[in-house]
């Protein structure tokens, strides 16, 4: 049996070094932090023929296999070196935090098609469109124009008021066709269909969904404005929305008649 299988040879170049053997003036040039996981460079020696000797530095060999950009020095101890690119930003806490901050700001603010952002001068929040900024500015108004008749809470938008009132009346017009759940908003129904039933809504880019006319008195829904008005006349003749709609219809009818009379002088 060969002697190599019986006697284990001492490792001539290990990753651990006896620093007591070095003079003080040479320690600073040779020292490499152990936290980086790198072995100190060793002079090259011709390896002896041995079939049973394992790698003397498995940590450095494992790191060299993970990243092909590391260079491997010849010899029994593999020495891993940093790549040529600048990686100082990975060790500098200040630059690392700034990098993360820039990425977060891109996700939060979004990228405007024209590169212009509309910024709120009160809270410094930015938007990609002027209409979004105009809607946001309403939240800074101290006077709330639209008040809830149930609890007195004020809102600056009729949409927010309508959504809030449904929490008092219990009106849930958007019903799931696959179960018994109903929701106050269309987006909540679409989220329910996607997460619970796995139904993905297919809409084209900027495609408007079919409008649903909801009776805030009883929760009845209609697909057309005419059907909604007929329902109000039959079931809720004293509804303020019906009076408002009647005024709009009367004004539209008067404008139509006026335009017809101006276009036909012989009438």
Curated annotation (Swiss-Prot):
Name of this protein: Putative transcription factor Ovo-like 1
A single BP term in Gene Ontology: negative regulation of meiotic cell cycle phase transition
GO MF term list: DNA-binding transcription factor activity; DNA-binding transcription repressor activity, RNA polymerase II-specific; RNA polymerase II cis-regulatory region sequence-specific DNA binding; zinc ion binding
Tissue: Expressed in skin, testis, kidney and weakly in lung. Not detected in heart, brain, spleen, liver and skeletal muscle.
Zn finger (C2H2-type) location: 118-140, 146-168, 174-197, 213-236
Record SUPFAM superfamilies: beta-beta-alpha zinc fingers
Entry's localization field: Nucleus
This protein's record includes keyword Metal-binding: yes
Signal sequence extent: none
Keyword Magnesium found: no
Alphabetical UniProt keywords: DNA-binding, Metal-binding, Nucleus, Repeat, Transcription, Transcription regulation, Zinc, Zinc-finger
Gene expressing this chain: Ovol1
Function: Putative transcription factor. Involved in hair formation and spermatogenesis. May function in the differentiation and/or maintenance of the urogenital system.
One GO CC term on file: nucleus
């Amino acid at each position: 049996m060969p002697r190599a299988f019986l006697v284990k040879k001492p490792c001539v170049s290990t990753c651990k070094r006896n620093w007591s053997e070095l003079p003080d003036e040479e320690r600073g040039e040779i020292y490499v932090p152990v936290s980086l996981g790198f072995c100190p460079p060793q002079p090259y020696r011709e390896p002896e023929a041995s079939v049973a000797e394992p790698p003397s530095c498995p940590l450095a060999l494992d790191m060299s296999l993970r990243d092909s950009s590391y260079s491997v020095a010849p010899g029994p101890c593999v020495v891993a070196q940093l790549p040529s690119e600048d990686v100082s930003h990975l060790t500098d806490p200040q630059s690392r935090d700034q990098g993360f901050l820039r990425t977060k700001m891109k996700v939060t603010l979004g990228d405007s098609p024209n590169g212009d952002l509309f910024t709120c001068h009160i809270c410094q929040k930015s938007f990609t469109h002027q209409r979004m900024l105009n809607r946001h500015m309403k939240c800074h108004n101290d006077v709330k124009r639209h008040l809830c008749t149930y609890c007195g809470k004020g809102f600056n938008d009729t949409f927010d008021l309508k959504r809030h009132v449904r929490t008092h009346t219990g009106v849930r017009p958007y019903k799931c066709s696959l179960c018994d759940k109903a929701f106050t908003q269309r987006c909540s129904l679409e989220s329910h269909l996607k997460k619970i039933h796995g139904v993905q809504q297919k809409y084209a880019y900027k495609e408007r969904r079919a409008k649903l006319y909801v009776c805030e008195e009883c929760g009845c829904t209609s697909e057309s404005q005419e059907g909604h008005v007929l329902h109000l006349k039959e079931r809720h003749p004293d509804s303020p929305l019906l009076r408002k709609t009647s005024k709009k219809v009367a004004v539209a009818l008067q404008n139509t008649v006026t335009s017809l009379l101006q276009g036909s002088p012989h009438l």
